[in-house]
Amino acid sequence: MRRTTYAGLVDEKYLDQEVCLKGWVQKRRNLGNLIFVDLRDIEGIVQLVFSQEFNPEALKVAEQLRSEYVIEVKGKVVARGEKAINPNMRTGKVEVEVSDIEILNKAKTTPFDIADDINASDDLRLQYRYLDLRRPEMQKALMIRNRITQTVHSYLDENHFLDIETPYLTRSTPEGARDYLVPSRVYPGHFYALPQSPQLFKQLLMGAGYDRYYQIARCFRDEDLRGDRQPEFTQIDIETSFMSAEEIQEMTEGLLKRVMKETLDVDIKTPIQRITWNEAMDRFGSDKPDIRFGMELKDMSGAVRNAGFKVFDMTLENGGQVKAITVPGGADKYSRKQIEEKQEYIKRFGAKGLAWVKVTDDGLTGPIAKFFTERAEDIKEAAEAKSGDLILFVASNRKVVADSLGYLRVAIAKEMDMINKDEFAFIWVVDWPLFEYSEEFDRYIAAHHPFTMPNEEDLDLLETDPHKCHAQSYDIVLNGYELGGGSIRIHRRDIQEAMFKALGFTKEKAEEQFGWFMDALDFGFPPHGGLALGLDRFAMLLAGKDNIREVIAFPKNSKASEPLTHAPSTVAPKQLDELYLKTDVPEEDE
């Protein structure tokens, strides 16, 4: 039988028509001479009716049905009785009286229910991912992802971008995250690397005159995982020639506006707000600020200076900061014990303590209130606090203050349900530092990557005082997540060489690793720039998920393994011999 429509699309317009449907048994209810079956497919669920009255043979077959059996049915669409109508379903006003049925395949009892609400561990879900993906919630998430990619293709094609693929097997660059390496059989002892991004290839395409490039690009990074990271991920990769940073941002806003409208029917306001990196750190304590709620960081230095509280005074004397966040209504919400728990929380960001006062009609209360009896109004004004609020202070250097209060701000907002989860708040963070200090490497590294162009007014500093340079770079942030980032690129060899020198490369090291690229810059590269948007993260946010695994068909778990296929795995000794490889694995890791 040829399928005539999808189960989830059968509604009143099919009344009195005969349909042929195919799908999975969601559930069965046996009332003796009457059996009801919910048939599920990619579009949804429709109710089937088997009756002794209109087909005894079909009823007998229906008695054999169990959950997840695959069936095809033929029958007539009829209206449900008034009391049987389900207003929550598209198909809720109709049902199909089945005249013919065939069981296409049987199914064992599944390890968890094929339903949105399930009680299963992440690894069990990944082990049986093909079952997990049957759940309507998962199908909806992947449909959102598909809608994003289709809209991206359409928008960029309309704007004269060329979809060009770049290599997966390329050269390792041992800067930044670890590469995934692929041994070469043809060149023993040599390795390809899977690309962490198509960065240099897309810049070469600009040098080749292709003007506007894009790619839905797979990228690979061998790094520790967290909720919004995977060892292999996908980005919407874009590069353009002869466009300024502002023009690239405007083009990106058009793309975001189209995606939001066509995916969720949400209108976003453009132009999107822009703030500098310095402003983001000062106001929100984060370079990816969530602007759906207030509770911004406030500089309390003037209000608390020389009031007699030694912690604050010594911090300010040593060039540090005293900042605070004001928790609306927090005076009654948070007990002393709960505030002490917050103090333990911020210690992970380097803070040594969390000072606090509660604002009352009579002034301030709390452990440090006695130092500020005469400053109560100054503190309330600086913190923008009113009676009933809780003011939380951190005193330290700029980074510790920003990190501590920035993370605390978000944690408290979640606890107090201050965040509108239906809101999509985009913001650009621009004018980044060109370099940032890495505690892991104990040196300065490129804040984005070493191919980022410094601001024009900072070009001289690249040779004399590079750590004061700012970059022509920009990040687009959505609801506190870095959705993507980009920059104007270096298109001149002399600037690229100066950049490598500032990063500590010797001339020989720069030539060995990137000489092939710098040689290309000698042949008339145009000014160019671009950005990359994280497709997985974008889909996660639009689908309302907390983990990108929920919008990837076959992801890895938090240990970078795949419970379904048991990857990574050992390989046959013959395969290693062909690659001239030997393994030396500690016993505890085997």
From Swiss-Prot:
The keyword ATP-binding applies. It comes from Ligilactobacillus salivarius (strain UCC118). GO terms for cellular component: cytoplasm. It catalyses: tRNA(Asp) + L-aspartate + ATP = L-aspartyl-tRNA(Asp) + AMP + diphosphate. ATP binds at R221, D222, E223, Q230, E482, G534, L535, D536, R537. It comes from the Bacteria. Belongs to the class-II aminoacyl-tRNA synthetase family. Type 1 subfamily. The keyword Nucleotide-binding applies. Its EC number is 6.1.1.12. HAMAP family: Asp_tRNA_synth_type1 (MF_00044). SUPFAM superfamilies: Class II aaRS and biotin synthetases, GAD domain-like, Nucleic acid-binding proteins. Catalyzes the attachment of L-aspartate to tRNA(Asp) in a two-step reaction: L-aspartate is first activated by ATP to form Asp-AMP and then transferred to the acceptor end of tRNA(Asp). GO terms for biological process: aspartyl-tRNA aminoacylation. It is found in: Cytoplasm. Residues 199-202 are annotated as: Aspartate. The lineage of its organism: Bacteria, Bacillati, Bacillota, Bacilli, Lactobacillales. Keywords: Aminoacyl-tRNA synthetase, ATP-binding, Cytoplasm, Ligase, Nucleotide-binding, Protein biosynthesis. Homodimer. L-aspartate binds at E175, R221, H448, R489. GO terms for molecular function: aspartate-tRNA ligase activity; ATP binding; catalytic activity, acting on a protein; nucleic acid binding; transferase activity. This is Aspartate--tRNA ligase.
